[in-house]
Amino acid sequence: MNKRRLKKALRRLINLPGGIYFFLYIINKIRHFYLKAIKSTRVAYPSTIMLELTNQCNLACTICPREYDYGKAMDKGKMSVESAKKIIDELWPYLDSIGLTGMGETFLYNEIEEIVDYIKTKNKGIIISVSTNAVLPNFIEKVSKIVDKVDTIQISIDGLDDVYEHIRKNASFQELDRNLRLLAKITSNTNTDIMLNMVVTKENYSHMPTLVKYTEEIGIKYMDFTLLNLASVTNIDRSYYDFYQSSHFSYVLSELDDTINKTPSVLVTERNFRTDNNFQKCPYPWTHFYICWNGYIAPCCAKPFPKELNFGNVFNTKVINVLNDTSYKRFRSLWYKNITPDFCDKCHFVDLESIK
């Protein structure tokens, strides 16, 4: 566990639910470990969820599933405040964390502060994270309202300068840079961490070491690297993954490791590209449950398209009923057998060979 996650865990332990809710929380934890021990396909109430408040966005990024077949076919909209609160009411005694993010730009949801405040009234120890592209007009004004209320603001930065603008269509790197520097100052000495996230592609991978230096230069402490997931990118063949095996990619990874060692003020929280991949590496059948803006629970955040696959709608029944629906349990049974569902075709958890 890295320092950032340890800090969050300690904050959570200090602020566990009180009274009868503490016993509900503990009983649910015991149930979780019991079901895991007996290899059940059922799950306890979730300790973490992703709540997609909106799937609308101001950008058209080349790496985003919204820009391909599944994304173009999806219904677009935003979750009502009442629906979001209903989900929180049902789950809060069991939650350790909640991500207010999804296929859209979080700060297009005008009631974001109201939702954050509502979660905190339930239990101030619930860890809240949001993701953003940080280039909306008046972004600083919007984000300032939840600084010191949320625990992590993750910001997408898929390269620098022209490479960034090539990938993140309709975005300006100059505007992003200005907002990042301002936000770093605003969040200084608060309980809100800023973390930059880069999706590693053929077009930008050489920027990885430079991005660590840039993160240090603008006064941000955390950086994350993730690989491009082709599960929802319909017009790119899985052979795209081959470049991750190239000698030059390996060279840049070594350069990245060297830069990280020389930049102790920046903690790179995720860059583990070298593990073996198969369906059982995927955690999403069991955790980080994804609730779409229209109430459907999709299998994961990499392919959150209810028209392709969903296990039920939480607006029609309780969340726990959907999580333990027969179709969801059947999906989990494949995980135990390490049989990849057709839905997961091209996912990097499965089809990307371990990077040597």
Name what the model sees in each region.
Residues 2-11, 52, 73-74, 79, ...:
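Radical SAM enzyme [4Fe-4S]-AdoMet core and its adjacent flexible, acidic
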Residues 68, 102, 157, 227, ...:
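Residues that line or immediately flank small-molecule/substrate-binding pockets and catalytic motifs
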Residues 56, 60, 281, 343:
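The −1 position to Zn-ligating cysteines in a subset of zinc-ribbon hairpins
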Residues 29-47, 67, 279, 296-356:
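Flexible mid-to-C-terminal extensions adjoining Fe-S/redox cofactors in radical SAM and related proteins
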Residues 58, 105, 113, 136-137, ...:
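Alpha-helix N-cap/helix-start and coil->helix boundary motif
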Residues 7-152, 170, 174, 178, ...:
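Conserved alpha-helical substructure of the radical SAM core
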